[in-house]
Amino acid sequence: MTYAATCIVAYLLGSIPVSLLVARRHGVDLRRTADGNPGAWNALEQLGPRRAWPAFAGDALKGTGAGLLGIAAGGVWLGYVAVGAAMLGHAFPLFAGL
């Protein structure tokens, strides 16, 4: 059960659309600008480096947090699996409609 719960939490962590939240804080909807990609690179192009760095940091912290959660819950192997689950959440986010 610990493995499944860790993977679910890691997936949900990866699903948080950090770039969209950062851009929304600055009054920009990334899905309606440039190529429509709600990612950190589009945030950089639309907001500039000073305002977009939290998007890059948030994406990095999602993966790091998932890995540390997995290691704490079940060792290195589960850490790798948790990072994979976070990557799946990042690529196929549950919270895409935010």
Label each residue range with its predicted role.
Residues 2-24, 50-98:
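Alpha-helical transmembrane segments
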Residues 20-52:
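Cytosolic, membrane-interface loops and tails of multi-pass inner-membrane proteins
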